[in-house]
């Protein structure tokens, strides 16, 4: 019995892993009954040999609450979540093999020994231990609810080869116990596994993913089909999901996580690490550096240029990643990220706060903003030209278009704001338009018509946007952070124009040619590269 095992002793010494040749250590889970001690052995292999193994993905839980397992005959302490997952998965793996090689993610067996995480692309499959339905565990839910949630997802998914979604109508609208199903699925999605950074790799890169909660199982493919079927059902029937209904809420949350995983799974189809960072920004990590490092392992090309180093602080990690992306891709998408991520006083204005720990666990809409950026052409096909003359300063080559002389809030941010307030806000914008006539750069109707077309497509990110006018009569909109006397720039490698604010560093009192990055913007008449054809002087702009 496990309770009769001696107290956990220090684990046996291991020979160092050959990280230069991408050597990893595998855990062999030995067969046994539920009551038997969890026993394992280890071996080392080279990734280049394409070893076949499964990855165990689980949420750590409280590191101070442990249970003993036998490793190479020695008793060692592991977290209670890992212990429960190994014990629960032992009979599942036994059905496949007499003993099976496993990568138990983030166990003390190899923590710190693996610096490059790209080897997950060779995984045969992965088991995601979402939780347990018995015992004193942090990630626990009643067995009946676990079974009900998995069974409902299986029913929503239907047969893998079926093209019909007729069954979805009954499951979503007429099943008597629908309320109970929704509650059970809510409990399942509340388990810690869904919100952790390090669980993403195991869900994205392997060939097959199995979610396990207690004795219940479901594949990621089935969850994906369930989500697709629900979306197709609402589309085909021309029905609108209840905006605030419990069914809509729980399925939307499921869809959000599945789509986030899908975004990451499309990295070979053109999506890049910036999409990945935003897709999983709501996931949590014990170490804030892992907000970057957990994603980095899924992009081996970038990982070759950026070493995983926990001696660096979060500012260094975020700065290094940005400069790496500019060097590799030749564009300034990272500056856009700096403008939309939460501000951190320890970071220069041009560095994205990629290590930010978001409190809520629902992703936002930044992925759509990145897609919008990718369609831009303000700097034509230029490649970013940058230099880093000193710590905290980024010199960027480009042109200065004009200075902002008037701005007006686009519309109120709250749906509860009275129409009178919105009308007055718009009247202020109309009253400022005569500046355009004085400069003679655009016609009134051209500007209004084009900008209304653009505003129809604005999403929630722009609810706090403002419309501005420059000294030469250019009209555009930008984030609410914009101020009068800010300047509009087109920077080499920047697909959208950027707003900069003249600034000064405290340590450089005599120099006033620094700029703080404010936000990106849209300016009528320069979005197709026109500003680079006006003969404006090319300049280096020093961002701080």
Where are each of the predicted segments found?
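Acidic/Ser/Thr/Pro-rich low-complexity tail/linker regions in eukaryotic proteins
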Residues: 2-43, 47-54, 62, 67-69, ...
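Acidic, serine/threonine-rich, low-complexity C-terminal transcriptional regulatory domains
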Residues: 52, 57, 61-97
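Conserved residues at the C-terminal ends of beta-strands
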Residues: 59, 101, 116
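Low-complexity basic/metal-binding stretches
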Residues: 94-106, 110-111
């Amino acid at each position: 019995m496990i309770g009769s095992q001696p107290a956990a002793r220090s684990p046996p010494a291991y020979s160092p892993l050959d990280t230069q040749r991408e050597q990893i250590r595998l855990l062999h889970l030995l067969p046994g009954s539920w009551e038997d001690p969890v026993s394992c052995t280890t071996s080392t292999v080279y990734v280049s040999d394409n070893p076949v193994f499964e990855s165990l993905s689980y949420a750590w839980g409280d590191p101070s609450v442990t249970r003993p397992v036998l490793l190479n005959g020695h008793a060692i302490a592991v977290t209670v979540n890992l212990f429960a997952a190994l014990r629960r998965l032992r009979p599942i793996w036994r059905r496949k093999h007499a003993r099976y090689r496993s990568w138990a993610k983030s166990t003390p067996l190899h923590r710190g020994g693996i610096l490059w995480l790209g080897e997950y692309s060779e995984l045969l499959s992965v088991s995601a231990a979402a939780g347990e339905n018995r015992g004193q565990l942090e990630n626990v839910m009643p067995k009946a609810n676990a079974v009900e949630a998995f069974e409902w997802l299986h029913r929503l998914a239907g047969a893998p080869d079926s093209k019909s979604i007729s069954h979805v109508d009954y499951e979503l609208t007429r099943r008597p116990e629908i309320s109970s199903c929704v509650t059970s699925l809510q409990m399942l999605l509340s388990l810690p596994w869904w919100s952790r950074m390090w669980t993403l790799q195991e869900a994205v890169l392997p060939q097959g993913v199995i979610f396990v909660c207690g004795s219940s199982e479901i594949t990621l493919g089935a969850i994906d089909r369930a989500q697709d079927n629900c979306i197709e059902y609402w589309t085909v029937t021309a029905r609108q999901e209840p905006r605030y209904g419990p069914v809509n809420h729980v399925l939307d949350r499921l869809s959000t996580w599945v789509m986030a995983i899908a975004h990451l799974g499309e990295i070979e189809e053109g999506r890049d690490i910036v999409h990945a960072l935003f897709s999983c920004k709501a996931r949590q990590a014990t170490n804030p550096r892992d907000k970057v490092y957990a994603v980095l392992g899924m992009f081996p090309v970038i990982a070759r240029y950026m070493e995983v180093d926990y001696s660096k602080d979060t500012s260094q990690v975020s700065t290094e990643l940005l400069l790496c992306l500019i060097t590799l891709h030749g564009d300034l998408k990272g500056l856009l990220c700096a403008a939309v991520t939460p501000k951190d006083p320890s970071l220069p204005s041009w560095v994205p706060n990629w290590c930010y720990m978001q409190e809520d666990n629902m992703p936002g809409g930044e992925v759509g903003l990145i897609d919008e950026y990718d369609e831009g052409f303000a700097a034509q096909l230029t490649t970013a030209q940058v230099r880093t003359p000193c710590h905290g300063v980024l010199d960027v080559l480009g042109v200065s278009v004009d200075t902002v002389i008037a701005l007006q809030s686009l519309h109120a941010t709250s749906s509860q704001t009275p129409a009178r307030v919105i009308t007055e806000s718009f009247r202020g914008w109309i009253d400022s338009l005569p500046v355009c006539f004085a400069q003679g750069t655009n016609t009134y109707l051209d500007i209004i018509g084009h900008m209304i077309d653009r505003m129809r497509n604005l999403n929630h990110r722009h609810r706090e946007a403002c419309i501005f006018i420059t000294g030469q009569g250019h009209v555009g909109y930008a984030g609410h952070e914009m101020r009068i006397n800010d300047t509009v720039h087109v920077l080499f490698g920047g697909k959208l124009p950027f707003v900069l604010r003249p600034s000064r560093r405290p340590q450089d009192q005599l120099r006033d040619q620094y700029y703080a990055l404010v936000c990106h913007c849209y300016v009528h008449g320069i979005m197709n590269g026109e500003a680079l054809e006006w003969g404006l002087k090319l300049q280096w702009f020093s961002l701080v």
